[in-house]
């Protein structure tokens, strides 16, 4: 039986096949953050010199990309990316996701929005019938912490400060437990409209285009 780490590697390798299809001297690849994304980055190293470069969704990923000799570009200098590859903490059959366990949700959402296709890579344990067992992360302006927490409690959630964590943007993370997510796009829009919320970790208004889920029997592919 394959371990979870081996399944993550399988998913990362499957995403590299998409890179192979689009690779070229002018191509820029968007790259996410997290343990599965790290494996994708390590595999992407073989494309150094075959693609123009990358855009990273976090300082952590940028450092790992650079360590492999891959050029890391500022998103402001990029007009087109064919694919963005990232993991998920949860994903459902609609390709809606909860992301942000690593705290990079805002930059992940921004970089993903520029790419033509979002390719989600994960092991099969991340596929759920309904989102919400994994606490929903929110990036929040520090001065708004208490006000945002009250608004989330009114929605039925239990917000908890991620102690000692500061995002790459200088903000805090609230992890919200116990939210009932029956309509992910509606909840995403509602939470994002709370003053002080930079963004929430629901990726449903713009979810993944393709999910590559590693199973004991190979890759299961879901697409829109």
Swiss-Prot record:
**Active site (UniProt):** 108 (proton acceptor)
TM stretches of this protein:
none
Q: Which GO terms describe its molecular function?
A: ribose-5-phosphate isomerase activity
Which GO cellular component terms are attached?
cytosol
Report the record's Gene Ontology biological process terms.
D-ribose metabolic process; pentose-phosphate shunt, non-oxidative branch
User: Per UniProt, which keywords does this protein have?
Assistant: Isomerase
Family annotation (InterPro entries): NagB/RpiA_transferase-like, Ribose5P_isomerase_typA_subgr, Ribose5P_isomerase_type_A
Source species, domain of life:
Bacteria
Q: Which reaction does it catalyse?
A: aldehydo-D-ribose 5-phosphate = D-ribulose 5-phosphate
Self-association and partners = Homodimer.
Record's family? Belongs to the ribose 5-phosphate isomerase family.
Per its UniProt record, what HAMAP family does this chain match? Rib_5P_isom_A
Q: What is the name attached to this protein's record? A: Ribose-5-phosphate isomerase A
